[in-house]
C-alpha cells in the first residue's frame, strides 16, 4: 500500500509529530483509491470533492505537511495570486494562515474550476475571486491538451482545446504589492514568467512549480534568470529523488515530464 511504502522510506520520527501522523492517516485512507475517480475526502474541519485521490494526497503532503506555501506577512490582509489553484487546497491553506487574505484564484481547466468553486463555497470561503481562465502571455486564449486531475497542459497529449486566457503581467500590474505569487501552471511558466519580468518588483514571495516536458526545451535557466534579475533569493527542491540519473532520465511514474522542481523565492 502507498502508506506503507511511504512509511518504510520515511524516518520513523514522522510518527512523533501530529502533522506526521495526520499525513500518514491521509495516506492510509486515500492513497490506494482507484485513480481518476471522483471522491469525497476529509481532513481537519474540511471536506472536499476531488477528481483523483492520488493527486490530492500529494497535494496535501506538499501544502500541509511540507508547508511549501508558508510565508510571513506584515499585514493581516496579504494580496495573494494563486495561478493554478486546482481543487482549492492551496487556498484553504492560505486562508488558514491569513483568514482576511485577498486572494485571486486562476484555474484553466473548466472541470477542475468547478471542483475549486464548489470546495471553497462548501467550506465557507466566499471572498476569493475565482477566474476560470489560464494565465498566459496574452489574453487571446491558449491551446491546452486535456488532463484528468492536475495534468492539463499546453504540452498535454490529450485532445487540444482553446482555453480563455488572461495576461498575468497585466493582472499583476494593477497591484501595488503582491505578498505571495504562486505559479503552478504545468509548463506554461517558461512563457508566462519572462513576460511578467518588469512587474515582479512588486512581488514579495514567489513560488514556481517548474515543469520540463520530454521533447521540449527544459528552459530552467530562462526561469531562474528572470527570478535573479528581479532581485530574489531562491531555494530549489524536488519531491522526487532519482537514483542513477544517467540511466533514469524520466520523472518516475510520469511519461511526459523528465523534471519537476519547486522554486521558492523571496526578498532578501
Labelled PLM ranges:
Residues 1-268:
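Phosphate/nucleotide-binding beta-alpha loop and adjacent structural elements of enzyme active sites
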Amino acid at each position: 500500500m502507498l502508506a506503507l511504502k511511504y512509511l518504510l522510506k520515511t524516518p520513523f520520527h514522522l510518527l512523533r509529530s501530529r502533522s506526521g501522523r495526520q499525513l500518514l492517516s491521509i495516506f492510509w485512507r486515500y492513497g490506494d483509491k482507484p485513480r481518476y475517480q471522483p471522491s469525497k475526502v476529509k481532513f481537519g474541519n474540511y471536506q472536499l470533492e476531488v477528481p483523483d485521490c492520488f493527486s490530492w494526497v500529494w497535494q496535501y503532503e506538499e501544502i500541509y505537511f511540507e508547508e511549501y506555501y508558508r510565508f510571513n506577512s506584515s499585514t493581516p490582509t496579504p494580496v495573494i495570486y494563486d495561478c493554478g489553484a486546482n481543487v482549492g487546497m492551496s487556498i484553504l491553506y492560505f486562508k488558514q494562515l491569513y483568514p482576511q487574505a485577498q486572494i485571486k484564484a486562476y484555474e484553466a481547466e473548466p472541470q477542475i474550476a468547478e471542483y475549486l468553486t464548489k470546495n471553497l463555497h462548501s467550506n465557507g470561503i466566499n471572498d476569493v475571486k475565482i477566474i476560470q481562465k489560464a494565465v498566459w502571455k496574452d489574453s487571446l486564449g491558449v491551446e491546452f491538451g486535456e488532463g484528468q486531475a492536475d495534468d492539463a497542459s499546453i504540452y498535454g497529449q490529450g485532445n487540444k482545446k482553446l482555453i480563455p486566457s488572461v495576461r498575468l503581467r497585466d493582472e499583476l500590474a494593477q497591484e501595488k504589492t503582491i505578498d505571495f505569487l504562486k505559479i503552478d501552471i504545468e509548463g506554461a511558466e517558461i512563457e508566462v514568467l519572462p513576460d511578467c519580468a518588469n512587474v515582479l518588483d512588486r512581488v514579495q514571495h514567489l513560488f514556481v512549480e517548474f515543469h520540463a516536458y520530454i521533447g521540449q526545451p527544459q528552459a530552467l535557466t530562462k526561469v531562474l534568470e528572470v527570478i535573479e534579475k528581479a532581485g530574489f533569493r531562491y531555494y530549489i527542491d524536488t519531491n522526487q529523488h532519482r537514483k542513477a540519473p544517467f540511466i533514469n532520465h524520466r520523472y518516475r511514474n510520469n511519461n511526459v515530464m523528465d523534471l519537476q522542481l519547486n522554486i521558492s523565492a523571496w526578498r532578501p
